[in-house]
A protein has these predicted regions:
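Hydrophobic faces of well-ordered beta-strands that scaffold small-molecule active sites
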Residues: 28-34, 84-88, 123-129, 178-180, ...
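A short alpha/beta connector and helix-capping loop motif
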Residues: 262-288, 322-324
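Single conserved hydrophobic/aromatic residue that forms the stacking wall/gate
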Residues: 390-399
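Catalytic domains of carbohydrate-active enzymes, especially glycoside hydrolases
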Residues: 24-36, 51-90
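Active-site acidic/histidine proton-transfer and metal-coordination neighborhood
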Residues: 107-132, 136-248, 252
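Histidine/acidic-residue-rich catalytic or RNA/ligand-binding cores of hydrolases
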Residues: 263-272, 292-302, 330-340
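Active-site beta-loop-alpha junctions enriched in small/polar residues
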Residues: 35-37, 91-93, 130-132, 183-185, ...
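Glycine-rich, aromatic-flanked loop segments that form ligand/cofactor-binding clefts
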Residues: 29-40, 77-93, 98, 104-135
């Protein structure tokens, strides 16, 4: 009997079909963020990173051209079991020599090479307007700016991204999740909290007034509790984005598990959201004391988030994307490690006897529930993971 066969039998004794778990996982798309490979710099300007976010470290090998970034992504993908989508920011537009378009004038043609890359690897594409790292971010504000010229520029950028998102979906044959996030906010206590949010609301409504096929483009709005330089007030708060998505047909909320107070757990928010939203999006990261965007590892909260998605039969309702960036280590390794960590978490959730555990809770057998939860932790998940890697032609960590 092989190691996998022995492990499979142990899981089967608890009613878990590991073969089925592996096949399900292979088909679950997870969006792979290109910005880990170049420290969120992009190709459309030479300025520094803004928007209340930052990368730390100076490890050699940062991708500096589209060709280098694509090559690094291909290298990382060789190490990944399962299905990946490509996640792009608008700042990764690729221009021909002598060509340039500002963000309010971006067109599908500026992303043609990314479409070719995605088709080569049978990937869908998700997209993000880039509301940071640009000279027209005025006083730290974009879509909520009181300066109408500034606000109009960024509204037009959002509309351009709607058109580009639809182009991606039509070309790849897969829906494009388009995420709206800004770092708009104030460093110190504001005199007016409502005004910026009313402008922000109007701006997003104008962006979403751009015609698009709702089956192809999946807009979402992302919240954040604070950022560097915007510690006192963030325009796009959790209450704002949840309310906006609830009241605007076709718009989803997006939760980033690094964008909340450290004692808030997105794993607890996921089932609450599933009670009310037919679908929503998730950015998966690892915050260390704040939204530090450390590389994802198989820690407790990562496992709990995966459990809540799987045990509530929501793999087809939650759009999952990675979002972290670490410049202190090998970037290809960082991208692959985070992807594999999320795959491990999903596999563990798929190999958990969820119905049995739920029955124990519903019948108030809490002592047995604790015992079984602890027993599940000791099951030979490593053998199931090794089988997934082998059947996906992906390297084992030991290699």
């Amino acid at each position: 009997m092989t190691g996998y066969e022995a492990a499979k039998a142990k899981y089967a004794a608890l009613g878990v079909d590991t073969d089925q778990a592996i096949e399900i996982l292979k088909k679950v798309p997870v969006s792979l963020h290109c910005w880990q490979l170049d420290d969120v710099i992009g190709f459309d300007n030479d300025g520094g990173l803004t928007g209340g976010i930052q990368t730390t470290g100076n490890y050699m090998g940062r991708a500096k051209t589209p060709e280098q970034l694509m090559a690094d992504m291909e290298e990382a993908m060789k190490l990944m079991p399962g299905t990946a989508k490509l996640n792009l920011h608008a700042s990764y537009a690729i221009f021909e020599p002598g060509e340039f378009a500002d963000r309010d004038a971006l067109e599908p043609k500026h992303f043609k090479k990314w479409v070719e890359f995605a088709k080569k690897h049978n990937m869908g594409i998700d997209f993000n307007p880039t509301f940071f790292s640009h000279e027209k971010v005025k006083d730290g504000l974009t879509l909520s700016s009181p300066d109408e010229e500034t606000r109009k520029f960024w509204i037009n950028h959002g509309k351009a991204c709607i058109r580009i998102s639809e182009y991606f979906a039509k070309e790849t044959g897969m829906p494009c999740v388009m995420n709206i996030w800004t770092g708009d906010g104030f460093k110190d206590v504001p005199a007016d909290r409502m005004g910026p949010r009313l402008r922000y609301k109007d701006s997003i409504e104008q962006i979403l007034s751009e015609p698009y096929d709702k089956n192809l483009v999946k807009p979402c709005v992302e919240s954040k509790v604070f950022g560097i330089g915007v510690e006192s007030y963030t325009v796009g708060s959790a209450e704002f984005t949840l309310s906006f998505a609830a009241l605007h047909d076709g718009c989803m909320p997006l939760m980033d598990n690094g964008h909340y107070h450290p004692l808030e757990y997105v794993s607890d928010k996921i089932p609450a959201m599933l009670c009310f939203y037919p679908e929503f999006a998730l950015h998966i990261t690892r915050g260390v004391r704040w939204d530090s965007d450390h590389v994802l590892i198989l820690d407790d909260e990562t496992k709990e988030m995966a459990k809540e998605i799987v045990r509530n039969h929501a793999l087809d309702r939650v759009y999952m994307a990675l979002d972290y960036f670490d410049a202190s280590i090998n970037r290809v390794s960082a991208l692959a490690t985070g992807f594999r960590s999320w795959q491990k978490a999903l596999l563990m959730a798929l190999c958990t006897p969820n119905e049995m555990l739920k029955e124990l809770q519903d019948t108030n057998q809490m002592s047995k529930l604790m015992v079984m939860n602890e027993a599940v932790k000791m099951l030979p998940i490593g053998e199931i993971w090794a089988c997934l890697l082998y059947t996906s032609d992906a390297a084992d960590e030991a290699r």
